[in-house]
């Protein structure tokens, strides 16, 4: 079955002609306009199908989709000036959320079928790259260890061809171990290594290539990773996205990570609303790097798209995975803007930060920076990008201690993210337990 999107800028006879050509149209949604029609009752009689209408056309479309569960496709028979680019992205977001294809005269947005895991699951996805998604995913895993035994399934652009299990609960992940991984030709700073290192949980690394506008991967090996996760004695699967792309599984709940430095348009428009609409919990990160007005706008956008979601505004604080007290260190991160506050935080822990670089994702510039790192006995570095094959190798060759850094999300809005994650975890575990009993 199909739903047709119509407007008052077309004569009813023309719309009827188009509906007949489409065939199998169960209803129509009126988007606006009145130039070429009389009353909607007249139009409805002429077309011979029910017409849904609301001041907010998305509300009308959502109702039409809810009341006609057999619909497979929404067909757009409207045009400028009734709908523009932004309107059509909003419509596409709603259609994809319902698993329905959205088709127009020269475009098609088709959802990828999303399977469900046999075990309870929480998705951690981002609205873009470099928003701190892996840090939040690690935080979620560490937090949930208090009530369950989680396993993280990642998918990265540098992930392994076959799913790779890292037993972070038992394996000692040292700089030397990671360097051996890198020297074997594998990506030792891949997300599943980072999660295992920072959260001491079991992780499974998968790969993906390409990402669509809405966030579906072009190719991925996640199915085999999920099968492996479901064979383990763990109770809950955390599905971790990659950049703005997410695993092709429908999780029981979602944590959506929004970076405060992102362009507001990428959150509010295009397929930002689609990602947000999945959220049960929204974590706004790096709030200390923008003005308060920007944060207010981001929160406003989130609440406008998904009012039921709980929103947390956070900053990242470096959490060294080794002792930095009394040591002269260098600091290496991916973000130039975060260097100053991170250095202050490490100095509050007793370190003396002599040098710093925000070029972790720019290898040539990073090597130039490292040449000037004199007089240090340790180097603190995020496990990202060139952390292993460049920074770790450079440090170990010189007998310098490597201290990996985690980025811990800390609320600045008076809320408690840890408690929110625990509530979400209990809700997901409880819901699946109820389903099993039924």
Swiss-Prot record:
Predominant localisation class: cytoplasm
Enzyme class: ligase
InterPro entries listed in its UniProt record: Cyc_diphosphoglycerate_synth (IPR016557)
Compartments (UniProt record): Cytoplasm
UniProt keyword annotation of Cytoplasm present: yes
Gene Ontology CC terms, in alphabetical order: cytoplasm
Keyword annotations from UniProtKB, A to Z: ATP-binding, Cytoplasm, Ligase, Nucleotide-binding
Catalyzed reactions per annotation: (2R)-2,3-bisphosphoglycerate + ATP + H(+) = cyclic (2R)-2,3-bisphosphoglycerate + ADP + phosphate
GO MF, one example: ATP binding
One example of a Gene Ontology biological process annotation: gluconeogenesis
Keyword field contains ATP-binding: yes
EC number in record: 6.5.1.9
Function in brief: Catalyzes the formation of cyclic 2,3-diphosphoglycerate (cDPG) by formation of an intramolecular phosphoanhydride bond at the expense of ATP.
Homology family: Belongs to the cyclic 2,3-diphosphoglycerate synthetase family.
Protein name: Cyclic 2,3-diphosphoglycerate synthetase
Organism: Thermococcus gammatolerans (strain DSM 15229 / JCM 11827 / EJ3)
Lineage per the UniProt record: Archaea, Methanobacteriati, Methanobacteriota, Thermococci, Thermococcales
């Amino acid at each position: 079955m199909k739903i047709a999107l119509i407007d008052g800028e077309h004569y009813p006879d023309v719309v009827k002609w188009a509906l007949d050509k489409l065939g199998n149209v169960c209803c129509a949604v009126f988007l606006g306009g009145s130039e070429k029609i009389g009353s909607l009752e007249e139009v409805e009689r002429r077309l011979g199908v029910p017409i849904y209408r609301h001041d907010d056309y998305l509300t009308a479309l959502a109702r039409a989709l809810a009341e006609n569960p057999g619909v497979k496709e929404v067909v757009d028979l409207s045009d400028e000036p009734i709908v523009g680019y932004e309107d059509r992205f909003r419509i596409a977001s709603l259609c994809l959320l319902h698993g329905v294809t959205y088709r127009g005269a020269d475009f098609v947005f088709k959802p990828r079928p999303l399977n469900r895991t046999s075990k309870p699951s929480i998705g951690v996805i981002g609205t873009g790259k470099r928003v701190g998604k892996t840090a939040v995913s690690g935080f979620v895993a560490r937090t949930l260890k208090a009530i369950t035994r989680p396993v993280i399934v990642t998918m990265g652009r540098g992930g392994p061809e076959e799913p790779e299990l890292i037993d972070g609960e038992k394996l000692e992940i040292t700089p030397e171990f990671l360097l051996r991984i890198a020297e074997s030709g594998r990506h030792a700073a891949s997300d599943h290594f980072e999660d295992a290192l920072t959260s001491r949980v079991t992780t499974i690394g998968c790969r993906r290539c390409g990402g669509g506008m809405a966030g579906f991967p072009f190719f991925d090996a996640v199915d085999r990773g999920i099968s492996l996760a479901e064979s383990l004695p763990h109770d809950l699967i955390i599905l971790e996205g990659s950049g703005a792309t997410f695993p092709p599984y429908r999780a029981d709940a979602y944590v959506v990570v929004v970076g405060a430095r992102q362009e507001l348009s990428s959150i509010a428009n295009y397929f930002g609303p689609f990602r947000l609409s999945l959220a049960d919990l929204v974590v706004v990160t790096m709030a200390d790097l923008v003005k308060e007005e920007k944060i207010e706008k981001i929160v406003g956008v989130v609440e406008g798209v998904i009012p039921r979601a709980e929103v947390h505004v956070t900053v990242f604080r470096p959490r060294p995975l080794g002792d930095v007290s009394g040591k002269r260190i260098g600091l290496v991160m991916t973000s130039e803007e975060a260097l100053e506050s991170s250095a202050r935080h490490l100095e509050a822990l007793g370190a003396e930060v002599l040098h710093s670089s925000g070029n972790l994702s720019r290898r040539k510039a990073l090597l130039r920076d490292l040449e000037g790192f004199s007089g240090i006995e340790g180097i603190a570095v995020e496990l990202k990008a060139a952390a292993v094959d460049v920074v770790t190798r450079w440090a170990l060759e010189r007998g310098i201690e490597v201290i990996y850094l985690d980025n811990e999300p800390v609320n600045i809005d008076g809320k408690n993210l840890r408690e929110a994650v625990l509530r979400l975890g209990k809700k997901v575990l409880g819901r699946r337990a109820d389903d099993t009993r039924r």
